[in-house]
């Protein structure tokens, strides 16, 4: 339904680096059942969940560029985004991989939720101010599409709200839902280990630019 709306009733139509683009802004939705991780309707699903699982496992390993190249060996479309910088303006180890950022913050997020069930501070930041170094450069390294994910417990359920600055809804949205839903379940499992008997709650998602 979201893709039909963007395609048939776009708020804006323009040419971008991905070609002719249909866009709506300030779009939100809620995933009814984040426990499945999957698009169950075969008419909607556009991704290979074997690839999605590989992507998730790599992300949670916290690996860097070399590990990414090994994980996605043979997948040319993925490999082009996990290369070292092409210009001397950036350090050779510069990257915007989500995995190291997520793995570094996970203990703090889990401990905050376990210690304070009413917390509003369990926010995992993805976009980093250092990423702005990419703005004037012509690099294949992707400027992060995700701002952050905020986790909160209400009525004995773990909820998450994901904020995206930019979202390709035709295909990439599906893998992003998979990754965030599995990460949500991972955090839930870790909280159970600490004695917090919670259920999966709401998975809400906001996109500044939803486009295809």
Residue ranges and their predicted role:
Residues 1-212:
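Terminal, non-catalytic protein-protein interaction segments that mediate quaternary/complex assembly
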């Amino acid at each position: 339904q979201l893709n039909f709306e963007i395609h048939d009733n776009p708020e804006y139509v323009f040419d971008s680096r991905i070609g002719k683009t249909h866009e709506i802004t300030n779009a939100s939705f809620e995933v009814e059942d984040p426990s499945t991780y999957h698009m169950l309707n075969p008419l909607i699903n556009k991704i290979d969940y074997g690839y999605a699982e590989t992507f998730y496992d790599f992300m949670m390993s916290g690996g860097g560029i070399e590990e990414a190249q090994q994980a996605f060996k043979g997948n040319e479309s993925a490999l082009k985004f996990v290369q070292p910088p092409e210009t001397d303006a950036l350090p050779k180890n510069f990257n915007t991989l989500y995995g190291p950022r997520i793995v570094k913050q996970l203990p703090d997020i889990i401990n905050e939720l376990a210690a304070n069930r009413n917390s509003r501070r369990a926010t995992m930041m993805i976009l980093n101010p250092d990423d702005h170094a990419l703005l004037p450069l012509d690099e294949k390294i992707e400027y992060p599409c995700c701002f952050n994910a905020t986790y909160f417990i209400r009525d004995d359920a773990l909820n998450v709200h994901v904020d995206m600055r930019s979202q390709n809804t035709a295909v990439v949205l599906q893998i992003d839902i998979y990754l965030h839903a599995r990460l949500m379940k991972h955090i839930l499992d870790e909280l159970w280990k600490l004695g917090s008997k919670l259920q999966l709650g709401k998975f809400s998602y906001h996109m500044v630019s939803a486009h295809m």
